[in-house]
Protein backbone atom coordinates (compact mmCIF):
# COMPACT_ATOMS: atom_id res chain seq x y z
CA UNK A 1 0.00 0.00 0.00
CA UNK A 2 2.83 2.35 0.93
CA UNK A 3 4.46 1.50 -2.40
CA UNK A 4 1.30 2.50 -4.28
CA UNK A 5 1.11 5.81 -2.37
CA UNK A 6 4.75 6.45 -3.12
CA UNK A 7 4.22 5.71 -6.83
CA UNK A 8 1.19 7.97 -6.85
CA UNK A 9 3.22 10.77 -5.25
CA UNK A 10 5.91 10.40 -7.89
CA UNK A 11 3.28 10.45 -10.64
CA UNK A 12 1.59 13.52 -9.16
CA UNK A 13 4.94 15.27 -8.85
CA UNK A 14 5.76 14.39 -12.45
CA UNK A 15 2.39 15.69 -13.70
CA UNK A 16 2.75 18.93 -11.73
CA UNK A 17 6.23 19.35 -13.15
CA UNK A 18 4.85 18.94 -16.69
CA UNK A 19 2.13 21.52 -15.98
CA UNK A 20 4.72 23.92 -14.57
CA UNK A 21 6.96 23.49 -17.60
CA UNK A 22 4.02 24.03 -19.95
CA UNK A 23 3.04 27.20 -18.10
CA UNK A 24 6.64 28.33 -18.17
CA UNK A 25 6.79 27.80 -21.93
CA UNK A 26 3.46 29.54 -22.47
CA UNK A 27 4.02 32.45 -20.12
CA UNK A 28 7.75 32.74 -20.40
CA UNK A 29 7.68 35.36 -23.12
CA UNK A 30 5.28 37.49 -21.11
CA UNK A 31 6.88 36.92 -17.76
CA UNK A 32 10.60 37.18 -18.29
CA UNK A 33 11.18 40.22 -20.46
CA UNK A 34 9.83 43.71 -20.73
CA UNK A 35 9.60 45.59 -24.04
CA UNK A 36 9.10 49.32 -24.21
CA UNK A 37 8.50 50.88 -27.63
CA UNK A 38 8.92 54.62 -28.19
CA UNK A 39 7.58 55.74 -31.61
CA UNK A 40 8.97 58.62 -33.59
CA UNK A 41 6.42 61.37 -34.37
CA UNK A 42 4.55 60.45 -37.56
CA UNK A 43 4.72 63.93 -39.06
CA UNK A 44 3.30 64.22 -42.57
CA UNK A 45 5.50 65.78 -45.24
CA UNK A 46 4.39 67.90 -48.20
CA UNK A 47 7.66 67.24 -50.05
CA UNK A 48 7.86 65.96 -53.61
CA UNK A 49 8.67 62.24 -53.56
CA UNK A 50 10.70 60.49 -56.23
CA UNK A 51 8.63 57.31 -56.44
CA UNK A 52 8.25 55.14 -59.57
CA UNK A 53 5.36 54.76 -62.03
CA UNK A 54 3.70 58.06 -61.15
CA UNK A 55 3.85 61.81 -61.75
CA UNK A 56 4.22 64.25 -64.62
CA UNK A 57 5.99 62.61 -67.55
CA UNK A 58 8.14 63.93 -70.40
CA UNK A 59 7.59 62.63 -73.93
CA UNK A 60 10.21 61.43 -76.43
CA UNK A 61 9.68 60.39 -80.04
CA UNK A 62 11.65 57.97 -82.22
CA UNK A 63 11.30 56.91 -85.86
CA UNK A 64 12.47 53.37 -86.56
CA UNK A 65 14.47 53.12 -89.76
CA UNK A 66 15.89 56.64 -89.42
CA UNK A 67 19.61 57.18 -89.85
CA UNK A 68 20.21 58.00 -86.20
CA UNK A 69 18.47 58.11 -82.84
CA UNK A 70 18.38 61.30 -80.80
CA UNK A 71 16.88 62.09 -77.40
CA UNK A 72 18.39 59.01 -75.79
CA UNK A 73 19.37 59.55 -72.15
CA UNK A 74 23.09 59.68 -71.51
CA UNK A 75 24.67 57.08 -69.26
CA UNK A 76 25.79 59.92 -66.98
CA UNK A 77 22.13 60.82 -66.36
CA UNK A 78 21.37 57.52 -64.63
CA UNK A 79 22.17 58.82 -61.14
CA UNK A 80 19.25 59.69 -58.87
CA UNK A 81 19.75 63.44 -59.25
CA UNK A 82 19.34 63.46 -63.04
CA UNK A 83 17.11 60.43 -63.45
CA UNK A 84 13.64 60.96 -64.85
CA UNK A 85 10.96 58.73 -63.37
CA UNK A 86 8.07 57.95 -65.65
CA UNK A 87 8.53 58.84 -69.34
CA UNK A 88 6.45 58.35 -72.46
CA UNK A 89 8.11 56.98 -75.60
CA UNK A 90 6.35 57.24 -78.95
CA UNK A 91 7.87 54.89 -81.52
CA UNK A 92 6.89 55.64 -85.13
CA UNK A 93 6.73 52.68 -87.52
CA UNK A 94 5.67 54.61 -90.65
CA UNK A 95 8.83 53.66 -92.57
CA UNK A 96 7.59 50.07 -92.49
CA UNK A 97 3.87 50.59 -93.08
CA UNK A 98 3.61 47.81 -95.64
CA UNK A 99 6.51 45.54 -94.75
CA UNK A 100 7.96 43.76 -91.77
CA UNK A 101 10.29 45.65 -89.49
CA UNK A 102 13.89 45.11 -90.49
CA UNK A 103 16.50 43.63 -88.18
CA UNK A 104 18.08 47.07 -88.05
CA UNK A 105 14.79 48.65 -86.94
CA UNK A 106 14.32 46.05 -84.22
CA UNK A 107 17.88 46.69 -83.10
CA UNK A 108 17.05 50.39 -82.86
CA UNK A 109 14.04 49.58 -80.68
CA UNK A 110 16.26 47.48 -78.45
CA UNK A 111 18.74 50.36 -78.21
CA UNK A 112 15.96 52.77 -77.20
CA UNK A 113 14.54 50.58 -74.46
CA UNK A 114 17.99 49.57 -73.23
CA UNK A 115 18.99 53.23 -72.83
CA UNK A 116 15.89 54.06 -70.78
CA UNK A 117 16.29 50.90 -68.75
CA UNK A 118 19.85 51.92 -67.80
CA UNK A 119 18.50 55.38 -67.02
CA UNK A 120 16.21 53.84 -64.39
CA UNK A 121 13.00 55.16 -65.92
CA UNK A 122 9.57 53.56 -66.14
CA UNK A 123 8.24 53.65 -69.68
CA UNK A 124 4.80 54.36 -71.09
CA UNK A 125 5.17 52.98 -74.61
CA UNK A 126 3.08 53.87 -77.65
CA UNK A 127 3.66 52.50 -81.14
CA UNK A 128 2.12 54.47 -84.00
CA UNK A 129 2.33 55.25 -87.71
CA UNK A 130 1.50 58.96 -87.61
CA UNK A 131 2.44 62.21 -85.88
CA UNK A 132 0.70 64.62 -88.27
CA UNK A 133 -2.98 63.70 -88.10
CA UNK A 134 -2.75 61.63 -91.29
CA UNK A 135 -2.99 58.09 -89.96
CA UNK A 136 -5.29 56.95 -92.75
CA UNK A 137 -2.50 57.75 -95.22
CA UNK A 138 0.39 56.25 -93.28
CA UNK A 139 -1.09 53.13 -91.64
CA UNK A 140 -0.52 49.67 -93.18
CA UNK A 141 -2.90 48.59 -95.90
CA UNK A 142 -3.80 45.39 -94.07
CA UNK A 143 -4.68 44.39 -90.54
CA UNK A 144 -2.34 41.44 -90.88
CA UNK A 145 0.65 43.77 -91.23
CA UNK A 146 -0.20 45.52 -87.96
CA UNK A 147 -0.53 42.15 -86.24
CA UNK A 148 2.88 41.20 -87.61
CA UNK A 149 4.38 44.44 -86.27
CA UNK A 150 2.89 43.60 -82.87
CA UNK A 151 4.58 40.20 -83.01
CA UNK A 152 7.94 41.71 -83.89
CA UNK A 153 7.94 44.57 -81.39
CA UNK A 154 6.68 42.32 -78.58
CA UNK A 155 9.80 40.17 -78.86
CA UNK A 156 11.85 43.23 -77.93
CA UNK A 157 9.43 44.74 -75.41
CA UNK A 158 9.24 41.47 -73.47
CA UNK A 159 12.96 41.73 -72.75
CA UNK A 160 12.34 44.98 -70.86
CA UNK A 161 9.44 44.24 -68.54
CA UNK A 162 11.40 45.80 -65.68
CA UNK A 163 11.32 49.05 -67.65
CA UNK A 164 8.12 49.06 -69.74
CA UNK A 165 5.28 49.69 -67.31
CA UNK A 166 2.40 50.04 -69.77
CA UNK A 167 1.57 50.30 -73.45
CA UNK A 168 -0.98 52.73 -74.88
CA UNK A 169 -3.28 51.99 -77.79
CA UNK A 170 -3.26 49.39 -80.56
CA UNK A 171 -0.75 51.07 -82.95
CA UNK A 172 -3.46 52.86 -85.00
CA UNK A 173 -5.10 56.27 -85.26
CA UNK A 174 -3.84 59.83 -85.43
CA UNK A 175 -0.85 59.99 -83.08
CA UNK A 176 -1.74 56.44 -82.04
CA UNK A 177 -4.83 57.70 -80.20
CA UNK A 178 -7.31 55.20 -81.65
CA UNK A 179 -9.22 57.63 -83.88
CA UNK A 180 -9.42 58.46 -87.61
CA UNK A 181 -8.13 55.05 -88.62
CA UNK A 182 -9.04 52.34 -91.09
CA UNK A 183 -9.01 49.91 -88.16
CA UNK A 184 -11.41 51.35 -85.60
CA UNK A 185 -14.35 49.02 -86.18
CA UNK A 186 -15.35 47.10 -83.06
CA UNK A 187 -14.13 43.88 -84.67
CA UNK A 188 -10.72 45.27 -85.66
CA UNK A 189 -10.15 46.94 -82.27
CA UNK A 190 -10.99 43.72 -80.49
CA UNK A 191 -8.72 41.68 -82.77
CA UNK A 192 -5.80 44.06 -82.33
CA UNK A 193 -6.06 44.38 -78.55
CA UNK A 194 -6.51 40.68 -77.92
CA UNK A 195 -3.50 39.94 -80.12
CA UNK A 196 -1.38 42.57 -78.37
CA UNK A 197 -2.31 41.05 -75.03
CA UNK A 198 -1.42 37.58 -76.29
CA UNK A 199 2.08 38.47 -77.50
CA UNK A 200 3.14 40.82 -74.68
CA UNK A 201 4.21 39.81 -71.20
CA UNK A 202 1.28 39.72 -68.72
CA UNK A 203 3.13 42.06 -66.35
CA UNK A 204 2.84 44.93 -68.85
CA UNK A 205 -0.36 46.95 -68.52
CA UNK A 206 -2.29 47.88 -71.66
CA UNK A 207 -4.66 50.79 -72.24
CA UNK A 208 -7.30 52.18 -74.57
CA UNK A 209 -8.40 55.73 -75.24
CA UNK A 210 -11.96 55.59 -73.86
CA UNK A 211 -13.93 53.54 -71.34
CA UNK A 212 -16.40 52.37 -73.98
CA UNK A 213 -13.54 50.92 -76.04
CA UNK A 214 -12.58 48.77 -73.06
CA UNK A 215 -16.17 47.60 -72.62
CA UNK A 216 -16.51 46.71 -76.30
CA UNK A 217 -13.19 44.87 -76.46
CA UNK A 218 -14.10 42.80 -73.39
CA UNK A 219 -17.79 42.65 -74.36
CA UNK A 220 -18.62 43.51 -70.77
CA UNK A 221 -18.88 46.39 -68.33
CA UNK A 222 -17.45 44.25 -65.53
CA UNK A 223 -14.55 45.70 -63.58
CA UNK A 224 -11.82 43.64 -61.94
CA UNK A 225 -12.44 42.65 -58.33
CA UNK A 226 -9.99 41.86 -55.55
CA UNK A 227 -10.35 38.22 -56.57
CA UNK A 228 -9.64 38.79 -60.28
CA UNK A 229 -7.33 41.82 -60.20
CA UNK A 230 -3.71 41.37 -61.29
CA UNK A 231 -4.27 37.79 -62.50
CA UNK A 232 -2.70 38.42 -65.93
CA UNK A 233 -5.98 38.35 -67.86
CA UNK A 234 -6.76 41.08 -70.38
CA UNK A 235 -9.40 42.52 -68.07
CA UNK A 236 -6.84 42.81 -65.26
CA UNK A 237 -4.33 44.54 -67.57
CA UNK A 238 -6.51 46.90 -69.60
CA UNK A 239 -6.57 50.48 -68.33
CA UNK A 240 -7.21 53.87 -69.91
CA UNK A 241 -5.32 56.80 -71.38
CA UNK A 242 -7.29 60.02 -71.75
CA UNK A 243 -5.64 62.71 -73.87
CA UNK A 244 -8.72 64.94 -73.65
CA UNK A 245 -8.86 65.03 -69.87
CA UNK A 246 -10.97 67.81 -68.32
CA UNK A 247 -11.22 69.53 -71.72
CA UNK A 248 -15.01 69.60 -72.09
CA UNK A 249 -18.05 68.03 -70.45
CA UNK A 250 -17.36 64.86 -72.44
CA UNK A 251 -13.55 65.15 -72.21
CA UNK A 252 -13.35 66.04 -75.92
CA UNK A 253 -15.19 62.97 -77.15
CA UNK A 254 -14.13 60.55 -74.43
CA UNK A 255 -17.65 60.22 -73.05
CA UNK A 256 -21.13 60.22 -74.61
CA UNK A 257 -24.76 61.00 -73.90
CA UNK A 258 -26.19 57.62 -72.85
CA UNK A 259 -27.05 56.72 -69.27
CA UNK A 260 -25.27 53.71 -67.85
CA UNK A 261 -27.18 50.45 -67.62
CA UNK A 262 -26.59 46.75 -68.13
CA UNK A 263 -27.95 47.08 -71.67
CA UNK A 264 -25.92 50.13 -72.77
CA UNK A 265 -22.34 49.08 -72.01
CA UNK A 266 -21.44 49.25 -75.71
CA UNK A 267 -22.35 52.95 -75.75
CA UNK A 268 -20.35 55.88 -74.41
CA UNK A 269 -21.97 56.99 -71.17
CA UNK A 270 -22.55 60.49 -69.80
CA UNK A 271 -19.71 62.06 -67.84
CA UNK A 272 -21.00 61.29 -64.36
CA UNK A 273 -21.54 57.62 -65.18
CA UNK A 274 -18.13 57.28 -66.84
CA UNK A 275 -16.46 58.90 -63.83
CA UNK A 276 -18.20 56.39 -61.56
CA UNK A 277 -17.05 53.59 -63.87
CA UNK A 278 -13.44 54.79 -63.67
CA UNK A 279 -13.67 55.25 -59.92
CA UNK A 280 -14.19 51.49 -59.62
CA UNK A 281 -12.10 50.28 -62.55
CA UNK A 282 -8.95 52.29 -61.93
CA UNK A 283 -8.41 51.01 -58.44
CA UNK A 284 -6.98 48.01 -60.31
CA UNK A 285 -5.64 49.29 -63.67
CA UNK A 286 -3.75 52.51 -64.49
CA UNK A 287 -5.29 55.71 -65.83
CA UNK A 288 -3.46 58.77 -67.13
CA UNK A 289 -3.04 61.09 -70.09
CA UNK A 290 -3.01 64.82 -70.62
CA UNK A 291 -5.24 67.76 -69.72
CA UNK A 292 -6.45 70.15 -72.38
CA UNK A 293 -8.37 73.38 -73.09
CA UNK A 294 -8.48 75.90 -70.24
CA UNK A 295 -12.06 75.91 -68.92
CA UNK A 296 -13.91 75.75 -65.58
CA UNK A 297 -13.75 71.93 -65.53
CA UNK A 298 -9.98 72.11 -65.01
CA UNK A 299 -10.02 74.90 -62.45
CA UNK A 300 -8.02 73.64 -59.49
CA UNK A 301 -10.76 72.48 -57.10
CA UNK A 302 -12.75 70.73 -59.82
CA UNK A 303 -9.62 69.20 -61.35
CA UNK A 304 -8.52 67.70 -58.02
CA UNK A 305 -11.98 66.23 -57.53
CA UNK A 306 -12.13 64.54 -60.94
CA UNK A 307 -8.48 63.43 -61.04
CA UNK A 308 -9.10 61.73 -57.71
CA UNK A 309 -12.27 60.00 -58.93
CA UNK A 310 -10.50 58.79 -62.07
CA UNK A 311 -7.51 57.61 -60.00
CA UNK A 312 -5.06 59.33 -62.32
CA UNK A 313 -1.45 58.30 -61.77
CA UNK A 314 0.39 60.10 -64.60
CA UNK A 315 -0.02 63.26 -66.71
CA UNK A 316 1.82 64.97 -69.55
CA UNK A 317 4.15 67.64 -68.13
CA UNK A 318 3.93 69.79 -71.27
CA UNK A 319 0.29 69.77 -72.36
CA UNK A 320 -1.87 71.77 -72.14
CA UNK A 321 0.39 74.66 -71.03
CA UNK A 322 -2.63 76.93 -70.50
CA UNK A 323 -4.06 74.48 -67.96
CA UNK A 324 -0.74 73.65 -66.31
CA UNK A 325 0.13 77.34 -65.97
CA UNK A 326 -3.28 77.99 -64.42
CA UNK A 327 -2.55 75.35 -61.80
CA UNK A 328 0.89 76.84 -61.14
CA UNK A 329 -0.68 80.27 -60.55
CA UNK A 330 -3.37 78.94 -58.21
CA UNK A 331 -2.79 78.17 -54.54
CA UNK A 332 -4.19 75.14 -52.76
CA UNK A 333 -6.11 76.33 -49.71
CA UNK A 334 -6.82 74.15 -46.70
CA UNK A 335 -5.55 75.42 -43.36
CA UNK A 336 -5.75 71.92 -41.89
CA UNK A 337 -3.50 70.48 -44.61
CA UNK A 338 0.30 70.37 -44.86
CA UNK A 339 -0.25 71.42 -48.49
CA UNK A 340 -1.92 74.72 -47.60
CA UNK A 341 -0.41 77.50 -49.74
CA UNK A 342 1.31 75.12 -52.16
CA UNK A 343 0.68 75.78 -55.85
CA UNK A 344 -2.11 73.77 -57.44
CA UNK A 345 0.39 72.20 -59.83
CA UNK A 346 2.58 71.03 -56.96
CA UNK A 347 -0.43 69.70 -55.06
CA UNK A 348 -1.53 67.65 -58.07
CA UNK A 349 2.03 66.45 -58.74
CA UNK A 350 2.25 65.18 -55.16
CA UNK A 351 -1.04 63.28 -55.46
CA UNK A 352 -0.69 61.67 -58.89
CA UNK A 353 -0.57 57.96 -58.18
CA UNK A 354 0.03 56.63 -54.67
CA UNK A 355 1.27 58.56 -51.64
CA UNK A 356 1.64 56.76 -48.32
CA UNK A 357 1.55 58.56 -44.99
CA UNK A 358 2.43 56.54 -41.89
CA UNK A 359 -0.14 57.60 -39.31
CA UNK A 360 1.13 55.75 -36.25
CA UNK A 361 3.17 52.77 -35.03
CA UNK A 362 2.72 50.72 -31.87
CA UNK A 363 3.77 47.56 -30.04
CA UNK A 364 1.02 45.42 -28.50
CA UNK A 365 2.68 42.63 -26.54
CA UNK A 366 4.87 41.11 -29.28
CA UNK A 367 2.73 42.36 -32.18
CA UNK A 368 4.19 45.36 -33.98
CA UNK A 369 1.60 47.47 -35.79
CA UNK A 370 1.89 50.11 -38.50
CA UNK A 371 -1.06 52.13 -39.71
CA UNK A 372 -0.65 54.02 -42.96
CA UNK A 373 -2.98 55.91 -45.29
CA UNK A 374 -2.84 56.25 -49.06
CA UNK A 375 -3.59 59.94 -49.69
CA UNK A 376 -2.77 59.78 -53.42
CA UNK A 377 -5.15 59.54 -56.35
CA UNK A 378 -4.43 55.86 -57.10
CA UNK A 379 -2.89 52.65 -55.83
CA UNK A 380 0.56 51.39 -56.71
CA UNK A 381 -0.20 48.79 -59.38
CA UNK A 382 2.97 46.84 -58.62
CA UNK A 383 3.18 44.81 -55.41
CA UNK A 384 5.77 46.10 -52.94
CA UNK A 385 8.02 44.18 -50.56
CA UNK A 386 7.53 45.34 -46.95
CA UNK A 387 10.08 44.89 -44.19
CA UNK A 388 10.55 45.77 -40.54
CA UNK A 389 14.15 45.86 -39.32
CA UNK A 390 15.55 46.07 -35.80
CA UNK A 391 19.13 47.27 -35.41
CA UNK A 392 20.75 46.86 -32.00
CA UNK A 393 23.05 49.42 -30.45
CA UNK A 394 26.02 47.20 -31.30
CA UNK A 395 24.98 46.85 -34.95
CA UNK A 396 23.18 43.49 -35.04
CA UNK A 397 20.44 43.49 -37.68
CA UNK A 398 17.17 41.54 -37.51
CA UNK A 399 14.81 41.84 -40.48
CA UNK A 400 11.23 40.60 -40.74
CA UNK A 401 9.03 40.59 -43.87
CA UNK A 402 5.52 42.00 -43.46
CA UNK A 403 2.64 40.29 -45.24
CA UNK A 404 0.30 42.77 -46.94
CA UNK A 405 -0.62 43.31 -50.59
CA UNK A 406 0.08 46.99 -51.22
CA UNK A 407 -1.82 46.89 -54.53
CA UNK A 408 -5.02 46.97 -52.48
CA UNK A 409 -4.14 50.03 -50.42
CA UNK A 410 -7.03 51.98 -51.93
CA UNK A 411 -6.86 55.81 -51.96
CA UNK A 412 -8.53 57.36 -48.95
CA UNK A 413 -8.29 54.18 -46.88
CA UNK A 414 -6.00 53.10 -44.07
CA UNK A 415 -3.92 49.93 -44.20
CA UNK A 416 -3.30 48.10 -40.93
CA UNK A 417 0.01 46.20 -40.97
CA UNK A 418 0.93 43.77 -38.21
CA UNK A 419 3.81 41.40 -37.54
CA UNK A 420 4.59 39.22 -34.54
CA UNK A 421 8.16 39.77 -33.32
CA UNK A 422 10.23 37.11 -31.48
CA UNK A 423 11.12 39.52 -28.69
CA UNK A 424 12.02 36.78 -26.18
CA UNK A 425 14.86 35.66 -28.44
CA UNK A 426 16.40 39.11 -28.66
CA UNK A 427 19.16 40.20 -26.31
CA UNK A 428 18.40 42.98 -23.88
CA UNK A 429 19.26 46.45 -25.05
CA UNK A 430 18.16 49.22 -27.36
CA UNK A 431 17.02 48.70 -30.96
CA UNK A 432 16.25 51.23 -33.66
CA UNK A 433 13.14 50.20 -35.59
CA UNK A 434 13.06 50.74 -39.36
CA UNK A 435 10.28 50.32 -41.92
CA UNK A 436 11.03 49.87 -45.61
CA UNK A 437 8.91 49.51 -48.76
CA UNK A 438 10.68 48.28 -51.90
CA UNK A 439 9.60 47.69 -55.48
CA UNK A 440 11.16 44.28 -56.28
CA UNK A 441 11.00 44.84 -60.05
CA UNK A 442 13.07 48.03 -60.04
CA UNK A 443 14.86 47.38 -56.74
CA UNK A 444 13.76 50.88 -55.76
CA UNK A 445 12.83 52.01 -52.28
CA UNK A 446 9.39 53.62 -51.98
CA UNK A 447 9.38 56.83 -49.97
CA UNK A 448 6.61 57.55 -47.45
CA UNK A 449 5.30 61.09 -47.05
CA UNK A 450 6.76 61.52 -43.57
CA UNK A 451 9.70 63.35 -42.04
CA UNK A 452 11.42 60.27 -40.57
CA UNK A 453 15.20 60.03 -40.79
CA UNK A 454 16.50 57.51 -43.31
CA UNK A 455 19.43 55.18 -43.85
CA UNK A 456 20.15 51.91 -45.66
CA UNK A 457 17.70 49.97 -43.48
CA UNK A 458 14.77 52.23 -44.34
CA UNK A 459 12.98 54.91 -42.35
CA UNK A 460 13.53 55.12 -38.59
CA UNK A 461 10.07 54.92 -37.00
CA UNK A 462 10.93 54.32 -33.35
CA UNK A 463 13.12 52.81 -30.64
CA UNK A 464 12.58 49.51 -28.82
CA UNK A 465 14.05 48.85 -25.35
CA UNK A 466 14.18 45.23 -24.18
CA UNK A 467 14.99 44.37 -20.58
CA UNK A 468 15.18 40.90 -19.04
CA UNK A 469 13.54 40.12 -15.69
CA UNK A 470 15.74 37.17 -14.78
Predicted segment positions?
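N-terminal Sec-pathway targeting helices
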Residues: 2-20
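Boundary/entry segment of secreted carbohydrate-active catalytic domains
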Residues: 31-86, 90-92
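Aromatic-lined substrate-binding rim segments of carbohydrate-active enzymes
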Residues: 72-130, 143-145, 200, 204
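An active-site-proximal structural segment forming one wall of the substrate-binding cleft
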Residues: 105-121, 139-166, 185-199
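Active-site groove signature of glycoside hydrolases
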Residues: 124-134, 153-186
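Catalytic-core regions of glycoside hydrolase
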Residues: 166-323
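Catalytic cores of secreted or luminal carbohydrate-active enzymes
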Residues: 300-360
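Extracellular/luminal regions of secreted and cell-surface proteins that mediate adhesion/ECM remodeling
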Residues: 344-470
